[in-house]
Amino acid sequence: MATVTQELDPAAAHVLTSAFPAFVKNVGTNFPVPALAYDATTDEAAFWSFIATSYGAGNVTVRVYWYADTATTGNVVWEAQLAAITPNSDSQDIETKAFATLNFVQDTHLGTTGQRLHSADITVSNLDSIAAGDHVTLRLARDANSTSATDDMAGDAYVVKVVVTYSDS
């Protein structure tokens, strides 16, 4: 039993025409930090697509690597949804495919440093009948209006990497 890993970069994200995180490149002291800037007051979402290479069974884990722009306290809520299509089998229109019900995690800022890197794991159990070889679209959103849980961290939350993992058996 092995774990399959899909790494998703901020620059590869796709967005709709509204309610999306801005792509930013923060110029650090020693290297640039590309990120998606999720707003604190408006729900925003970004999308990535990948092939479910060697998917076996079980839940999918979405690990969000993020940091706060300025805040040193508070909670941020991340939501993940999947939409899976089996090529040459499903008759679903790829442009109108619906997402499975979302899963979420509430992560607490660990304090003291505004731009401290955090990671939060979302266990995705609503899998949209994912199978090996499926074309999968991931929706990652910040729940700024606290529909799923309380998101009270002030300012932007910057996503620097998303890692999707699942079992091959």
Regions found by a protein language model. Name each.
Residues 39-57:
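Short beta-strands within extracellular/lumenal beta-sheet-rich domains
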Residues 76-91, 162:
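Extended low-complexity, serine/threonine- and proline-enriched intrinsically disordered segments
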Residues 141-169:
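Proprotein-processing/basic-patch segments
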Residues 58-68, 76:
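A short beta-strand element within beta-rich, extracytoplasmic domains
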Residues 72-80, 154-159:
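Short coil-to-beta strand junction motifs in C2/discoidin
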Residues 116-148:
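Cysteine-clustered segments with highest specificity for TGF-beta superfamily mature ligands
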Residues 1-41:
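N-terminal leader/pro-regions and domain N-caps
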